From Swiss-Prot:
One of its GO terms (molecular function) is monooxygenase activity. PANTHER family: FLAVIN REDUCTASE-RELATED, OXIDOREDUCTASE MDPK. It is an enzyme of class 1 (oxidoreductase). Oxidoreductase; part of the gene cluster that mediates the biosynthesis of the dimeric xanthones cryptosporioptides. The pathway begins with the synthesis of atrochrysone thioester by the polyketide synthase dmx-nrPKS. The atrochrysone carboxyl ACP thioesterase dmxR1 then breaks the thioester bond and releases the atrochrysone carboxylic acid from dmx-nrPKS. Atrochrysone carboxylic acid is decarboxylated by the decarboxylase dmxR15, and oxidized by the anthrone oxygenase dmxR16 to yield emodin. Emodin is then reduced to emodin hydroquinone by the oxidoreductase dmxR7. Its EC number is 1.-.-.-. The keyword Protein transport does not apply. Pathway: Secondary metabolite biosynthesis. Keywords: Monooxygenase, Oxidoreductase. This is Oxidoreductase dmxR7. The keyword Coiled coil does not apply. Belongs to the avfA family. InterPro entries: NAD(P)-bd_dom (IPR016040), NAD(P)-bd_dom_sf (IPR036291).
Length: 238
């Protein structure tokens, strides 16, 4: 049985990850959130579920974070914000606290302890390779509209990569996201999909985290629809 920690459990992506994980009885969930009541309202399946442990607290509570991520296979960093304000550092603060928690766990453990992978929700918009097919007029608009949020993500990636010698990270980079049904997904290192649902995105994140061959460690990973033509006929960049 594999255990996964989700930081940002009440957000669209975090709740979708939990819903997908709970489809299998072989998964255990450590759900980290600021408001347990809100989480239970959003995802009733977590109530009295023996495969779910809820941790209520701040992303700055390193002790509680250590309890949450200890013994897990992967940690999903999906704490996000839509507020594009100067000095935004929601993602960096979360990543910093997680690294501090892992340092604490490592210091207290016996040699050879296997630490969890970190799976960061980032964006294809800040990736020159994945975003290379975006229209030349569109990407600058997106970068300007969420400039501080994107800078926070960019610096978070730099920070996590600086710890790559002892902690593996995967950088998940979708394009547009929507609240929609699951339509099937596939992982890619070369493309981005114009729009994909949170359910499909989260399924892709779980697949990358569960990969025992470590093919996605340290990589920028896109998640696209398994049948690419379904939405592109309606939501084309052209």
């Amino acid at each position: 049985m594999a255990t996964y920690a989700i930081l940002g459990s009440t957000g669209n992506c975090g709740s979708a990850i939990i819903q997908n994980l709970l489809k299998s009885p072989n998964n255990k969930v450590h759900a980290y959130c600021r408001n347990q009541t809100k989480l239970q309202r959003l995802i009733p399946e977590v109530v009295d579920n023996k495969n779910v442990q809820i941790f209520q607290g701040s992303i700055y509570d390193v002790e509680l974070l250590a309890d949450c991520v200890r013994g897990t296979k992967a940690v999903f960093l999906v704490v996000t914000t839509n507020d594009n304000v100067p000095g935004c550092r929601v993602s960096r603060d979360c990543a910093t606290s997680v690294i501090q928690a892992l340092q604490k766990i490592k210091a207290e453990a016996s040699p050879g302890l296997k630490l969890p992978k970190l799976v960061l929700l980032s964006s294809a918009t800040i990736d020159d390779h994945l975003a290379r097919h975006m229209p030349g007029w569109f990407r600058p608009i997106m970068l300007a509209a969420a400039s501080h949020v994107y800078e926070d993500l960019r610096l978070t990636e730099v920070f996590l990569r600086s710890h790559a010698d002892w902690v593996s990270s995967i950088f998940i980079k979708p394009a547009g996201l929507s609240v929609d049904v699951s339509r099937g997904h596939k992982l890619t290192l070369d493309e981005e999909e114009s729009f994909i649902s949170y359910l499909d995105l989260s399924a892709g994140m779980i697949e990358a985290a569960a990969d025992d061959e470590s093919r996605y460690d340290g990589r920028n990973v896109g998640v696209e629809l398994s049948s690419r033509g379904e939405l592109r006929c309606v939501l084309s960049w052209d």
